[in-house]
């Protein structure tokens, strides 16, 4: 099939380029996030590995990814392990403070492209930041069973992060949540009170969660969730200790409700991004998206972010 043809073409091209025959190997789940088959070309002046992950259920064949790594030595592209994880003292050195502006720097960029891999791309950035750059978004997508069109459901995001955290013995702590029916009902009450004040349309259906986000008014949400200084302070106080310690915060949002500082390839629906800082003087949140270099460091008003 097309996958096998493409794989053989790549292998033949690498063999012709290097002038040596590859060595085949397998990496188990103990050595990798998912099982992979691989081939390596090692010579005096360089090293290349080619790896694939596939699965089969009955007669159905699923090709997950083909990836290639190249470097000047075999060690430079070797798969790392838990010993390469960064220490708390190391990550705190990435925090930059300028007056009342605090930003975590040096978080590697992973571009999710058009695939809707926001959860795994964002998680891969965190792993790389913590010194675990042997974990990539394609492996994480396979582990979390993330499809190209299934990366934007908020509940699915939480479940996928839980799977990833369990696999790597990483604790995930929820700082703020709208993930259950009680949270939603409380939000709905606050939203309708704010809508009355602003003389805007209320939401009557208590069960249509997705419909609410599709039609929510940004100004009403801001008044409901960030209408008082205490609401803003409470939200900022929850993330401040993590940012000061050099720990980025996962941030699940609904796009299309408040203005964005840059045009996005995704304009509506759920999305996962990173909170990397804040400016207490300007009352802004500093964040990062997994859409390439232009989205490394962006800013929006705290009230918009909380909404």
Question: PLM ranges: what are they?
Answer:
Residues 1-34:
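Long, charged/polar, surface-exposed segments that mediate recognition or autoinhibition
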Residues 35-38, 45-51, 267-273:
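Short, surface-exposed coil-to-beta transition loops
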Residues 9, 13, 117, 121-125, ...:
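Extracytoplasmic/secreted proteins, especially bacterial periplasmic and envelope-associated proteins
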Residues 2-5, 148, 262-267:
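Short consensus segments that form the blades of beta-propeller domains
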Residues 56-213:
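Active-site-adjacent structural segments surrounding the nucleophilic cysteine of cysteine proteases
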Residues 56-102, 256-267, 276-307:
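Noncatalytic regulatory segments and standalone regulatory/sensor domains
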Residues 194-201, 209-288:
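Active-site-adjacent substructure of cysteine-protease-like catalytic cores
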Residues 25-41, 46, 235-238, 294:
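Short aromatic loop motif centered on NTY/YTY
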């Amino acid at each position: 099939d097309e996958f096998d043809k493409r794989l053989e073409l790549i292998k033949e091209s690498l063999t012709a380029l290097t002038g040596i025959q590859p060595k085949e190997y397998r990496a188990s789940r103990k050595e990798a996030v998912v099982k992979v088959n691989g081939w390596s070309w090692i010579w005096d002046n360089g090293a290349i590995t080619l790896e694939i992950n596939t699965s089969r259920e009955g007669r159905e064949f699923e090709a997950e990814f083909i990836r290639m790594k190249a470097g000047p030595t075999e060690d430079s592209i070797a798969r790392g392990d838990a010993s390469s994880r960064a220490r708390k003292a190391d990550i705190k050195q990435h925090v930059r403070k300028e007056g009342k502006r605090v930003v975590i720097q040096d978080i590697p960029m992973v571009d999710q492209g058009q695939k809707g891999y926001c959860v795994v791309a964002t998680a891969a950035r965190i792993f790389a930041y913590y010194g675990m750059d042997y974990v990539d978004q394609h492996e994480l997508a396979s582990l979390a069973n993330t499809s190209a069109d299934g990366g934007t459901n908020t509940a699915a995001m939480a479940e996928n992060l839980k799977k990833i955290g369990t696999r790597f013995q990483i604790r995930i702590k929820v700082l703020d949540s709208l993930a259950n029916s009680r949270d939603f009902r409380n939000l709905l009450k606050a939203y309708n009170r704010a809508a009355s004040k602003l003389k805007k349309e209320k939401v009557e259906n208590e069960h249509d969660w997705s419909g609410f986000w599709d039609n929510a008014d940004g100004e009403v949400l801001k008044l409901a969730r960030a209408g008082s200084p205490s609401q803003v302070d409470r939200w900022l106080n929850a993330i401040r200790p993590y940012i000061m310690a050099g720990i980025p915060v996962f941030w699940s949002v609904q796009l299309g409700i408040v203005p964005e500082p840059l045009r996005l390839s995704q304009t509506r629906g759920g999305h996962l991004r990173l909170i990397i800082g804040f400016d207490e003087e300007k009352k802004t949140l500093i964040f990062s998206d997994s859409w390439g270099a232009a989205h490394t460091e962006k800013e929006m008003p705290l009230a918009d972010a909380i909404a």
